[in-house]
Amino acid sequence: MSDTLYRSPSMAIRSSTADMGALTSMSVADLGSLTRLEDKIRLLQDDFESERELRNRIERERADLSVQLIALTDRLQDAECATDSQIESNRKREVELSKLRKLLEESQLENEDAMNVLRKKHQDVCLDYTEQIEQLQKKNSKIDRERQRLQHEVIELTATIDQLQKDKHVAEKMAQKFEQQTIELSNKVEDLNKHVNDLAQQRQRLQAENSDLLAEIHDQKVQLDNLQHVKYQLAQQLEESRRRLEDAERERSQMQAQLHQVQLELDSVRVALDEESAARVEAEHKLSLANTEITQWKSKFDAEVALHHEEVEDLRKKMMQKQAEYEEQIEIMLQKVSQLEKAKARLQSEVEVLIVDLEKAQNTIAILERAKEQLEKQVLEMKSRIDELLVELEAAQREARAALAELQKMKQLYEKAVEQKEALARENKKLQDDLHEANEALADANRKLHELDLENARLAGEIRDLQVALKESEAARRDAEARAQRALAELQQVRIEMERRLQEKEEEMEALRKSMQFEIDRLTAALADAEARMKAEIARLRKKYQAEIAELEMTVDNLNRANLEAQKTIKKQSEQIIQLQANLEDTQRQLQQTLDQYALAQRKISALSAELEECKTALDNAIRARKQAEADLEEAHVRISDLTSINSNLTAIKNKLETELSTAQADLDEVTKELHAADERANRALADAARAVQELHEEQEHSMKIDALRKSLEEQVKQLQVQIQEAEAAALLGGKRVIAKLETRIRDLEVALDEETRRHKETQSALRKKDRRIKEVQMQIDEEHKMFVMAQDTADRMLEKLNIQKRQLGEAEAMTMQNLQRVRRYQRELEDAEGRADQAESSLNLIRAKHRGTVAVGKATDVYVVEED
């Protein structure tokens, strides 16, 4: 076996008869080139559509290559069959040659003469064979040059393999780093799960608090309805009290006019009584004079009495009758005078009662005015407080709506990030599937190339066997030159057949070389196209990812700004909470003051009730201790004048009370309207709180979905790690770049996961802040509800005071009505007394006229009147 030495610029490779190693190195070089091509093709699978197109193209090219490889295998099989048939024919020829040797040995003696001719012919044949051998050597030199080129490629492939091994080592380090990062991410995920559980507990607690708040709000609504009903009743009672005051004012004016008339009538009655007393004195004086005259006439006419005894008896009887009549009239007049005195005393007592009642009414009116002023102040303070609370509630509602809008924006951004994450996960999965398919296709191509390498090695071995067989046949021919004269024709035929077969083999080898060169050119062109497409795709993806990175940076900036705005709003809300707490303290102080005022009013009411009892007892004592009629009349005149002034004051006070009641009614209407508005705002605030709670529930459900997605992504990351390990084990050389690409994708996914976790934390913090704000708003609503209840209590107390005032006004009106009835009765009695006085005067005039007539007759007739005891 001869050895040949081939040198290259990088190394020298020794090839011997065992050229299988060189051919296997060629197959390894082809495998390296194909793996390099597959590696470059895998780099083009970043985008889904471009990957699909490239994969289809590669599959079509692979199908073409498989068809060509099948054709080549068929040709190699045909060549193998031809070589087998040639070997069998050679064996047959060897058998025939052995037979021919025998024949030659037998015919050696016969063919000695023809040896020279055959030797010449044999020399010609040897020349032909040498020419053929030279041609075969040229072909072998060409094959050796191609083998050297392939060896150079093998050297380059070994260098690339070393580089890939280095990349693999770096990738293993990165994989370890990624494993550590996955462990850290799993820890973070556990922390997030704990945080989600805490949020769920907070959500349950918030739901319980919300249900309690809804129950309290329902109770407050019921209380508001009751207070509105009570307010309506109080308004009706105020209207009735206003009407009663108007009626009392009218009755008071009528009573004042009647009192004036009674005063005039009392003056006339007093004058009449003076005249009657003067007339009675004169009548008594005249009676005494008449008695003296009678005594004188009695002494004078004693003598005549005896004469005129019968006449005197008649006259005396008449005088006695007249005297009895006069006495009866005097008694009647005295009775009338006593009745008048009694009426005067009764009127005096009633006037005193009226004065006491008027004083009480004045006191109650002053108390009511003070209470009304205090109530007006309280109503104004409560009104201003309610306005402030409404303004604060509206501001809180606006802030809550702004916070909800910000939360909605954050939610939309979070959903977009989740969708991008899902799209990346889907793309990663598709890339993994494509990588698996490409690895399978690469394994198939490697297997087929290995089979082709084996076929090439087998063909090379057959060629070497043929060369050996040719050499052996040449030696056998040289040995059998003397004995091959008879087989020369057959040898010539064998030569021709061998030439034909060698020509066919050469043509087949040339066709194989051309086809291999064509395939190599086509693969290089496809590789160039794939590299161009890969560069274009890489540029496009670079731009795409740069745009996505810019968008992510913009979203991060927006989120930072939103975070700053949220912090500002939190500061503003904290300041508002401080202001609300200060306002709450002020309202509590005002409530305490109102309670103190209410206690003072209660004490005043108790004192007034005690004074009322004392006045009743004093009135009874005053009724029992009546004075004389004249002093009572004079005091009655004085008190009537006082009553007139008091009545005028009462009218002014009544007008003032009416105006104040109208203003209080208007204030109460405004307070009711504001209470209705506050109720509606509270309802709206509760509706906003319910919507915020519902959005909180939705956000928590969304966070649970995100946790599920996170778990699925973790499982996908684990699967990717397993697939990466499998790809590393399967790809050996060309999978490093794919691993690096997948590692970059995993890093991107991890960065996206970190971003999503950060956003999730931010959203959770925003949710916690909104929960705190909702709690604060609920606390404010509770405080406002308490203030509203306090205001309702104060309104109830005011209404109770108004009812008391109305009752007192009704009692005063009843007393004024009673006084008016008494005055009217007194007027009727005075009229009756005046009538009786007129009758008494007329009767006195008649008595005087009769008395004058009787005196004149006595002087004319000298009649003596004897007075008998």
Swiss-Prot record:
UniProt xrefs under InterPro entries: Myosin_tail, XRCC4-like_C
Physiological role: Paramyosin is a major structural component of many thick filaments isolated from invertebrate muscles.
Entry GO terms, CC: myofibril; myosin complex; myosin filament
Localization annotation: Cytoplasm, Myofibril
Name this polypeptide is given: Paramyosin
Predominant location category: cytoplasm
Coiled-coil parts of chain: 32-855
Matches recorded under Gene3D superfamilies: 1.20.5.340, 1.20.5.370
Subunit structure: Homodimer.
UniProt keyword annotation of Membrane present: no
Protein's gene: PARA
Organism from which the protein derives: Anisakis simplex (Herring worm)
Database matches in Pfam families: Myosin_tail_1
Lineage: Eukaryota, Metazoa, Ecdysozoa, Nematoda, Chromadorea
Family note: Belongs to the paramyosin family.
Keywords (A to Z) from UniProt: Allergen, Coiled coil, Cytoplasm, Motor protein, Muscle protein, Myosin, Thick filament
Residue ranges, annotated region (Nonhelical region): 1-31, 856-869
